[in-house]
From Swiss-Prot:
Capsid protein self-assembles to form an icosahedral capsid with a T=3 symmetry, about 28-34 nm in diameter, and consisting of 180 capsid proteins. Homomultimer. InterPro entries: Capsid_prot_S-dom_vir (IPR000937), Viral_coat (IPR029053). This is Capsid protein. It comes from Oat chlorotic stunt virus (isolate United Kingdom) (OCSV). The keyword Nucleotide-binding does not apply. Belongs to the icosahedral plant coat protein family. Its main location: virion.
Length: 454
């Protein structure tokens, strides 16, 4: 008989689940007689989850699933005596699955195992966000990939210790590239569920350690070595080719999103996630940092108290007294909203344009046009630290030039985003400087800014 779990009447789910539980218990007893109570409970739970995902089952099918699952859990060679010997001495006949039978630090509880030749891993993540209204709150569930994390700098073909921290706040685009665009429109948030997973990018011939942990004080410095990382109360450590996940314990407190200005990060952040790698080697030559794993975040978050997060700022500078000593001239500056300022340098080679922006990602454009008024003097084409396409043309009685730069800028809370324009000697001329800034919400803009490879 085949039972389809997707077609169970509404009044029967309890009875059907009970029948399935009994069937799974019988299958476990058939495959591994005498399994301990705790081990059996864990096995039954895992087998039921597999069966429910399939949607249909038969008695023989459940037995096959039970045998496969018990093998993955290392229980096929289980005997009570070998289990007791394993617990006491670390020896025995029980097979250990390194990715499952680990303590808080991700180390095996006992026994040894060789790295497999290869691992086949299917990663099924939530492809579409779930957005629901629950009372006054917007509840969002989603999965995001932050990007590849690099190892430390290698020395003698072994990478150095490297640990990086990222603040767990929905308003931070560095760690929540998709969620942050929505979260900045709300005053407060509360995580219902939060986890971080490291998905390996390397083969099984790599040795060393990688890990992911969580520090509930986001103002703390990240661990400086593996001993400090191991001291984190919530962390997972593994081989470079093994997947690692850390589940974050979420409290019931509402906190301000990243756009709120606070003297102490602990008042607005749930904490900070830290990722670590140390002594990674592949037995060959390593001449540069390696991309070791992707960092994936899964979450369910509540957002409350909507707020308007629109922002724009424009700076205009016009001058008819343009000199080489004052690259942007002495004309009046006109600003709107937040006050970007032009600071003329004491030399003719640098000019610093300073923007004060709230937290978020912004697209900043710069437009500079100049004219010498004569054909005899041709100004040198300016360059910028961000790079741009610049032009300089001489026609008739006038020499003029235009440059246009468009680049994303990210601000963490209310910090200053400084853009350096390298402007060489220019003759007296007319100059117009235009620098609008607007909040950037496009995924491409975030991808240009978010680089966790470091």
């Amino acid at each position: 008989m085949t039972l389809n779990l997707r077609k169970v009447p509404a009044y029967l789910p309890g009875k059907v689940d009970g029948a399935l539980t009994n069937l799974v218990h019988a299958a476990v007893d058939h495959v591994v007689p005498g399994l301990g109570k705790a081990e059996k409970a864990a096995a039954v739970y895992n087998i039921k989850q597999v069966v429910k995902k399939l949607g249909t089952y038969t008695e023989q099918g459940v037995k096959k699933i039970a045998k496969k699952t018990l093998g993955e859990l290392g229980y096929l060679n289980y005997t009570p005596s070998s289990h007791l010997g394993m617990a006491i001495t670390g020896r025995g006949t029980k097979q250990i699955n390194m990715s499952r039978s680990t303590n808080a630090g991700g180390f095996a509880l006992g026994g040894t195992t060789a790295a497999p030749v290869s691992i086949s891993r299917n990663i099924n993540r939530r492809s579409k966000p779930s957005i629901k209204m629950m009372g006054d709150a917007v509840v969002i569930s989603h999965s995001e990939m932050l990007g590849a994390i690099n190892s430390g700098t290698p020395s003698s073909n072994v990478t150095a210790f490297r640990c990086t921290g990222y603040r767990a706040n929905p308003g931070m685009s560095t760690i929540f590239p998709w969620l942050s665009a929505t979260a900045v429109n709300y005053e407060k948030y509360k995580f219902r569920r939060l986890s971080f997973t490291l998905v390996p990018l390397v083969s099984t011939n790599y040795s060393g350690r990688i890990g992911v942990g969580f520090d509930y004080d986001s103002s703390d410095l990240v661990p400086g070595n593996r001993q400090e990382f191991y001291a984190l109360s919530n962390h997972c450590e593994n081989m470079p080719w093994q997947e690692s996940t850390v589940e974050i314990k979420c409290d019931n407190a509402y906190r301000f999103t990243g756009t709120h200005v606070a003297a102490d990060n602990k008042l607005i952040d749930l904490g900070q996630v830290v990722v670590m790698s140390d002594s990674v080697s592949n037995g060959g030559t390593i001449s540069a940092a390696l991309p070791l794993f992707d960092l994936i975040v899964n979450y369910t978050v509540e957002l409350i108290e909507p707020q308007q997060a629109l922002f724009s700022s424009q700076l205009y500078s016009g001058s008819t007294t343009f000199t080489s000593g004052i690259p942007l001239g002495t004309g009046a500056d006109t600003t709107t909203v937040v006050g970007p300022t032009v600071v003329n340098s004491t030399t003719v080679t640098n000019c610093v344009v300073t923007f004060k922006l709230p937290a978020g990602v912004f697209e900043v454009s710069y437009f500079i046009a100049w004219s010498t008024g004569t054909a005899a003097v041709v100004p040198t084409v300016p360059t910028t630290g961000a790079g741009s396409k610049l032009s300089n043309t001489s026609t008739g009685s006038n020499s003029y030039g235009v440059c246009f730069i468009n680049s994303p800028v990210e601000c963490d809370l209310l910090l200053t985003a400084t853009v350096l324009l390298i402007i060489p000697t220019l003759p007296s001329s007319t100059c117009v400087f235009h620098a609008p800034a607007r909040r950037c919400t496009t995924p491409m803009c975030h991808r240009l800014l978010t680089s966790l490879a470091g």
